[in-house]
Amino acid sequence: MSINQIQDEIIEEFDLLENWVDRYELIIDYGKSLPKMSEADMNERNLIDGCQSKVWFTAELDKSDSNNPIVIYHGYSDATLVKGIVALLIRVLSGHSPKEIVDADLYFIDKIQLQEHLSPTRNNGIVAMLKQMRLFALTYLSILK
């Protein structure tokens, strides 16, 4: 599935819900499916600066298909709602090539009106998470050239 197809799927899931109480619950449910990150990876180096809660991200370049290497993201947060946001971002970007990630237009955040329903500090956190995810992809893209 392409990044845009995944975004469209998420938009459809949110469109089925009539209010933001249900949408928050959906985000929290996404977070419950996120596997716990290893204690070794939950360190200062992987901590995302700019988030209100503690958020950790790692990435690896999977070259098992040498013709199409993909980035696999792992993330976690100590806050329930933020963990769901981490899960959403991973769902959209993980499993795609570094170029696809760097070039992606992440419109689903606006379409589901997520930023309108979060505090400014949480919104800054989303920006910081996406910046780090793109930085990982950009680093892998430069390695592959």
Task: Give residue spans per PLM region.
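N-terminal intrinsically disordered, cationic/polar leader segments
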Residues: 3-54, 61-65, 109-145
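Functionally constrained cores in energy, signaling, and assembly domains
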Residues: 7, 75, 93, 104, ...
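Conserved interaction-surface patches within small, structured recognition/assembly domains
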Residues: 61-80, 90-94
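Primarily the active-site beta-strand->alpha-helix module of PP2C/PPM metal-dependent phosphatases
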Residues: 86
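Glycine-rich phosphate/pyrophosphate-binding loops
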Residues: 95-112
